[in-house]
Amino acid sequence: MLPLHSSESELPTFHSNDELRYAGTCRDRALAEGPGVGLRVRLEPTLERFVDLRHGPQAQQPSEQCGDLLVRDRDGNWTYQFAATVDDYVQGVTLVVRGDDLLASTGRQIQLARLLGRAEPPAFLHHPLIMKSPLQKLSKSDGDTGIRELRERGLTPAQVIERALSLAGV
């Protein structure tokens, strides 16, 4: 783990998938952990290969995509990448099904899981995003209707699945 004190403005823009790539600014600073200091995991410059059940064979080099992986931000919050990887590992998840927008982060989660002790990664399937309009994805965090609400409205499980498949363009 690498403590860091870099601000987002110190990070160069990396033009692959519009991600920011950490340049290693704090790698050699010997910062102590504490308030206002985030944590990163130093990723190895290895190629992560996996087969996505929809997209087929994939190869990603996380250290080139994002640099050292942020796992806890300066406010002390664990990142999605870290929390999802730990949850999947602890719960013994063997199949991760999620949107295409997360395909590019799969290699870093596989490498992080291996660093945490997971011998075999789960299988992955990345599906088209479910859109409520041509430019906006469906999102419960934006107040869009969830499965519970659809079931409360009387839709059967089959109707909910049919609706989701239709919205996903399948």
Tell me the role of every PLM-derived stretch.
Residues 158-170:
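Generic C-terminus detector
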Residues 1-139, 146-151:
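Active-site cores that bind ATP or allylic diphosphates and position pyrophosphate for catalysis
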Residues 118-119, 155, 170:
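Helix N-cap/coil-helix junction residues
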